[in-house]
UniProtKB/Swiss-Prot annotation:
Name of the molecule in the record: Large ribosomal subunit protein bL20
Cell division among keywords: no
Record GO biological process: ribosomal large subunit assembly; translation
GO molecular function, one term: rRNA binding
Entry keywords, A to Z: Ribonucleoprotein, Ribosomal protein, RNA-binding, rRNA-binding
Phylogenetic placement of the source organism: Bacteria, Pseudomonadati, Pseudomonadota, Gammaproteobacteria, Vibrionales
Gene expressing this chain: rplT
GO cellular component assignments: ribonucleoprotein complex; ribosome
Family as reported in the entry's similarity comment: Belongs to the bacterial ribosomal protein bL20 family.
Amino acid sequence: MPRVKRGVQARARHKKVLKQAKGYYGARSRVYRVAFQAVTKAGQYAYRDRRQKKRTFRALWIARINAAARQNGLSYSRLINGLKKASIEIDRKILADIAVFDKATFTVLVEKAKAAL
């Protein structure tokens, strides 16, 4: 059987991994074996956190809406219930944005929610 030589492919694969590990500390950016583990783990964290990011942002929006609603004398849950009853369909992302940057509009929304309760 002829000898199989894969030096070119191995070199390319190693270069690709080391390029991905650029900026890592110590051996993680220089030694292929360590870099491969670091890059693999980083990929797992990235995959997991892309999903967690959605939950984290929703929690942030809710915290902001709750804080603004309480300044207007209403809890978060009662505000959302009131908005649903007033058939105001506005998602939490936009509602949080309004609460932070346009307090007058948010106050109007709170008043409409209070009236619908």
